[in-house]
Amino acid sequence: MEDMAAGNHCTVTEFFLAGLSEKPELQLPLFLLFTGIYLITMAGNLGMITLIGLSSHLHTPMYYFLSSLSFIDFCQSTVVIPKMLVSFLTEMNIISYSECMAQLYFFLTFGIAECYTLAAMAYDRYVAICNPLLYNVTMSYQIYSSLISGVYIFAVICSSFNTGFMLRTQFCNLDVINHYFCDLLPLLNLASSNTYINEILILFFATLNSFVPVLTIITSYIFIIVTILSIHSREGKFKAFSTCSTHISAVAIFYGSGAFTYLQPSSLNSMGQAKVSSVFYTTVVPMLNPLIYSLRNKDVSIALKKILERKKFM
């Protein structure tokens, strides 16, 4: 504990998480609601990973990226939801200093990884639709493996910088985090030391990790739309668009909820509003992604039917 708090002269050993709501009558309903969300999230994302692994016709870069996205969503929800569930059952939801920093680190890692995974998926769709004859060369095993590895490596680097400087931040007088998990801004609100460098890092990485993926996605879809419009057959246009529709939905939900959570003006963004919008970003989005891809993706639906039919005859 002391090692992790090196440089923190006012040694803090634990924090208190305020939780999502202080109303006693809401604790049990909220516990049941988020337990259900977590179970659906686990079943959906682990099910998607298993389905892709068992279905040979889904062994393509597109679905390997989807499998990686499901892994990220599963991990992201596991980092946040279990501790939130504890807050509904206890009056004082205590989290140790080291556990808080670990939660912050993994939350940032998987959040950043999701940004770049969605960008990589957009690039994959661009290659498949705009350069189909070169797809197997452009998206070879080495290429998409490098993209997936690069996503995680870069996410680890970014989160390490932010968490590392948070470890150097002093917390002397306040130890109640007005949130249901350890996030950057609620922790900085408790800091008793100068947080200028932390704020610069947050601004830099937030801009970088928003601008680069969004620019990649927008550029990819501009070329995709131009290519789709040049297709003469109506059936060809529909087929090309249908391969992108699920990804567009996932991107819209993820970035829409993220923007609503983190980009509101401070004058409009009370802590209560921040908690509510964070709930959607951290718990609902990981639950929705596998549902979107299973309900709206024809290949996934066919693979699921085959698996279920195989089970019937066993």
Curated annotation (Swiss-Prot):
Q: Where in the cell is it found?
A: Cell membrane
Listed GO CC annotations: plasma membrane
Q: Which residues cross the membrane?
A: 32-52, 69-89, 101-121, 147-167, 185-205, 211-231, 248-268
Pull the Extracellular topological domain ranges from the record.
1-31, 90-100, 168-184, 232-247
Q: Please tell me where this protein is predominantly located.
A: membrane
Q: Which family does it belong to?
A: Belongs to the G-protein coupled receptor 1 family.
Instruction: Tell me the protein's name.
Output: Olfactory receptor 8G18
Q: Which organism is it from?
A: Mus musculus (Mouse)
